[in-house]
């Protein structure tokens, strides 16, 4: 174990099976929630270093609601959030460039399904790393005054 | 839908208001009357009548002005002009301002009933058209999202699991197993691409696209597309040569979809190019227009294929050697996008020698449409209020 904990929120068990496998082979500890509701519960009773969320769940683009909710939460917004989606047209016309938008789609990373193994692991490493540097910066800032 | 229609009668003569109300009293209508244009307009805004009878000659706002404002407020409201000085000119004037019919004074009760019945029919048709259009739109949207989600989800799950297997994360594959898995992965890939292209195509709403128009730097867009394909071209040792006129003014359009068009054309050019050849891309400004042409020295297009290459799902007889079969949608989508820009996309080709695709875009889209502005407004009027 490299000690990093990832929460995966996606309602497709077969898709989750593969992504969980990739992450676990890379020594991450993975917890899966099959709905936004389960995801919120998991965030309440567990500690995580990264959240990966799918866009299309349940009756529509519920993943976007999850992203907005997390980024509004004082504590949870510090968690890096990676969005994975198979639905291009829901997030931006033709999906050219980076669809992130600080209010519409407040996520830290965005990948399109199916995700290449290396691409996924690189993105996860990058987000976990930027989280650490952000923490370091905050600590430093805290020390200065 | 309730079949009780609301009718408003705007006339300064009390006799006319009363007799009209009386004639229709037995019918299943809600009847309101107004003595002048101002109060008539106020009532129109308040309860959106189905039919409005307007007297042409009234003190204050004239009947024609009232007509015009009702039409602007809600073009689906059916208006009928009542007038004492019936001339062809005044009738034509009223029609131009959106009146549906014309009732010369004095009129008989039967005449009035008949014209009311006709107007109610018209109103019903207009409302039905709106409902139908709306339903069609909902079906189209739902269908697209069902296709996206229900068709893609299983394929995405399959593909993600294949990646895990192919990357040897659940044990090494022997060469035969690996080969078979690669084949499976490629087939799933092209199926996913087909679904993506198809949903892209159905999600292009031309009127939505126009709302996003802004000045686009075409040479910059073209070089973006060139950049995307650089690696693919290099793999076949194909050189991409861009030749751009010095000062090219921006074109009014939608950057995202125009990029899609240029990428489509360039992707095709590379796909059908011979190894070690070159593709020339020319950008020229013309008379209020911009031309972008992409010429390859590839296999070319058979003469009998040319009339159909912009049709949905059409694939030419000659396919690129070694390349994957296309979906037959790329050019169809490109044509749709270019049409939305009031431009044109054409091809010239000689089998065995190569093809040239030319996109012509007007500097300012919309100019050509202003001629038929009234006609367009008429067509829009039917569904503008929904």
Regions found by a protein language model. Give the residues of each.
Chain A
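His-Asp phosphorelay/catalytic-motif detector in bacterial-type signaling
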Residues: 47-49, 74-80
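Active-site beta3 strand of CheY-like receiver
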Residues: 47-53, 57
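Short hydrophobic/Thr-rich beta-strand motif most characteristic of the beta2 strand and flanking loop
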Residues: 27-35, 42
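Charged docking surfaces used in two-component/phosphorelay signaling
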Residues: 17-25
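Alpha4 helix (beta4-alpha4-beta5 surface) of REC/receiver domains from two-component response regulators
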Residues: 61-65, 88-111, 118, 122
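Short acidic/polar segment at the start of the alpha1 helix of CheY-like receiver
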Residues: 12-18, 117
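The C-terminal output helix
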Residues: 122-140
